[in-house]
Swiss-Prot record:
PANTHER family: GTP CYCLOHYDROLASE MPTA. One of its GO terms (molecular function) is GTP cyclohydrolase I activity. Coiled coil: none annotated. One of its GO terms (biological process) is tetrahydrofolate biosynthetic process. Keywords: Hydrolase. The gene is folE2. Converts GTP to 7,8-dihydroneopterin triphosphate. InterPro entries: GTP_cyclohydrolase_FolE2, GTP_cyclohydrolase_FolE2/MptA. The keyword 4Fe-4S does not apply. This is GTP cyclohydrolase FolE2. It catalyses: GTP + H2O = 7,8-dihydroneopterin 3'-triphosphate + formate + H(+). Belongs to the GTP cyclohydrolase IV family. Transmembrane segments: none annotated. It comes from Fervidobacterium nodosum (strain ATCC 35602 / DSM 5306 / Rt17-B1). The record marks C146 as: May be catalytically important.
Amino acid sequence: MLKDVQNERDNRNIYLKRVGVKDLRYPIVVLDRTNVTQNTIATLNMFVDLPKDYRGTHMSRFIEVLNEYHLEINPKRIKEILRSLKKVLNAKRSVIEITFPFFLLKKAPVTGSESYLEYTCSFEAEMNGDHLDFSTTVTAPIHTLCPCSKEISEYGAHNQRAKCSVTFKSKEMVWIEDIIEIIEESASAPIFTLLKRADEKYVTEHAYDNPKFVEDVARDVALRLKKYDKIEWYKVEVESFESIHAHNAYACLTSDEIEKI
């Protein structure tokens, strides 16, 4: 019989909060509001805690657990994965972080030309005992146009791509597409992969008529999220890749601050 080195006793008396596998690329299926499901490729991190008297964890068991559940990734399945990790690895805590690209088919505003746009999403969950802490993050590319630049210039205004990330905790199922719509409706204009000339004209003029600082976008997203009853807690981050500055502009808030108003 082969020696099990991981199961050797360790006498250094040091508890490890997280041990496991990182940056595992893996095919998964996620829920899609329009098409029911969507196939994508995720990057996963999976961890458990390690008692002070255990020398190592069993890395292969993380993959074995994932193999049982990879066909569909949703909050219910993630809870089952975490419970299985704790059981097979004899742990009190388990953590999973899943980041993946999510694609939507978008129509250009004038010509209706269709193209796919990529969004970045992630699930982060930790089970400590029987308590589950679960959050979802949705990041969307957006377009911002500077209100100050528009106000002080005789013509034109500096504008650029930006990104907005919403991290939230919810008591019910929330579609990724719902969060994307909230973000895009709060920007100067949305981003498109394919635009013909008539579309470019529309998007350019729409952004000019709807100037936004990153602060404006963050606040407008927060106001829309506040009306979304399914969401219990949220964090909004907006970063603009400034076209005329050597730095990015950034704004951040959480629902904790909003509740104090």
